[in-house]
Amino acid sequence: MSQYMMVAVAAVVAVAGSSQISRRSTGGTQEQEILNELLSNYDMRVRPPPSNYSDPMGPVTVRVNIMIRMLSKIDVVNMEYSMQLTFREQWLDSRLAYAHLGYHNPPKFLTVPHIKSNLWIPDTFFPTEKAAHRHLIDTDNMFLRIHPDGKVLYSSRISITSSCHMQLQLYPLDLQFCDFDLVSYAHTMKDIVYEWDPLAPVQLKPGVGSDLPNFQLTNITTNDDCTSHTNTGSYACLRMQLTLKRQFSYYLVQLYGPTTMIVIVSWVSFWIDMHSTAGRVALGVTTLLTMTTMQAAINAKLPPVSYVKVVDVWLGACQTFVFGALLEYAFVSYQDSQRQTEQAKSRAARKAQKRRAKMELVEREQYQPPCTCHLYQDYEPSFRDRLRRYFTKPDYLPAKIDYYARFCVPLGFLAFNAIYWTSCLVMVSRLV
């Protein structure tokens, strides 16, 4: 009898052990069994049932969330910018729900990036894209997450170069508004409707937008006012708009400061003696060539546009002031040469008259006053006398032109600055 009891106990232990092994095996392969059961009758060619069960023919709602990881290479010439982002889409596919399958303690979600090719994915594309790629190092930077109720989260890391239609009328005081759109390529609004995540539609990695060399990201707005209507139907669209403010401090140092100094240097010509032709011409030509070179260098960084920019007004005015200084000397030199020609003719006429008078006069003793040369000493003018001579209005017309130019031209440049900067501030305030 004892032998029978021992055999019975051994049998019970063996059955219990095999049952425990079976439960452990079932727990270890639970996710695999869930996936096999979900995909057994799944057809990726058919879109999921509508999100709104009350409308059996309604569209699938795809909720979108974007995280901007990097913003760089804002190219004004090609009107484009580059950014790296994490693009997330979320939708409900009731065919993938596994809460009702009866598994004990099912997982909170299934992370299954390897079955992407077996699932229905929204055919989202970016209309403003010029170039883009997904990151594959060390593996494909994406994941798929399936929740018990059938909610699917698809996330992917993308680098994209997108076009941005820039308005450069206020360059370099401009604000740029760059639109980033996403649309379904094949499904109309009867099949897919996009909506932004109401909690956080766009997220920024810390530091993004504040480390750009010439711009600063000041604002991000989202909307859905970009629905595309074509002859094949209406396609839902979402839009993210980036507001980029150009950093003016760079252009103050590299553009406005140097050009202002060139204009001021050209005014030195008004203080140089009108008979110093070589010095005044060399100064005028040098400043004019420098101004032209700077203008060409600045325009090389901009696209050829058909409208006038505020920087064109500034450069044109500076070049006008520099060229005007050179023309002023040309006019002064011409007036001086005309005056000297008239004086030479007058002296020649007086000399001829004196010669004729000498021939008619009878020689007579002429009185010579005693020499008083030793009574006078050489006089060295003081600094005050020299300063007074510079600021005393002359009677000679060419010198009078130089005199007025010394004061009128700087005042004219100051008046231009007042009008220019006031107009710029008014136009910029209308954009903000």
From Swiss-Prot:
A Pfam family of this chain: Neur_chan_LBD
Ranges of the Extracellular topological domain: 19-249, 300-306, 427-432
Disulfide bonds: 164-178, 226-237
Residues that, per the record, bind L-glutamate: 69, 88, 155, 184
Glycosylation sites: 52, 219
Compartment annotation: Postsynaptic cell membrane; Cell membrane
PROSITE patterns in UniProt: NEUROTR_ION_CHANNEL
GO molecular function: chloride channel activity; extracellular ligand-gated monoatomic ion channel activity; transmembrane signaling receptor activity
Main location, first listed in the record: membrane
Domain of life: Eukaryota
Membrane topology, Cytoplasmic segments: 273-277, 328-402
Membrane topology: Multi-pass membrane protein
Known tissue expression: Expressed in motor neuron commissures at the anterior portion of the worms.
Keywords, sorted A to Z: Cell membrane, Chloride, Chloride channel, Disulfide bond, Glycoprotein, Ion channel, Ion transport, Ligand-gated ion channel, Membrane, Postsynaptic cell membrane, Receptor, Signal, Synapse, Transmembrane, Transmembrane helix, Transport
Signal peptide (residue range): 1-18
Transmembrane segments: 250-272, 278-299, 307-327, 403-426
Quaternary structure, from the entry: Pentamer.
NCBIfam families, sorted: LIC
Entry similarity comment: Belongs to the ligand-gated ion channel (TC 1.A.9) family. Glutamate-gated chloride channel (TC 1.A.9.4) subfamily.
UniProt function note: Glutamate-gated chloride channel subunit; channel properties may be modulated by the formation of heteromeric channels. Glutamate binding triggers a rapidly reversible current, while the anti-helmintic drug ivermectin triggers a permanently open channel configuration.
Protein name: Glutamate-gated chloride channel subunit beta
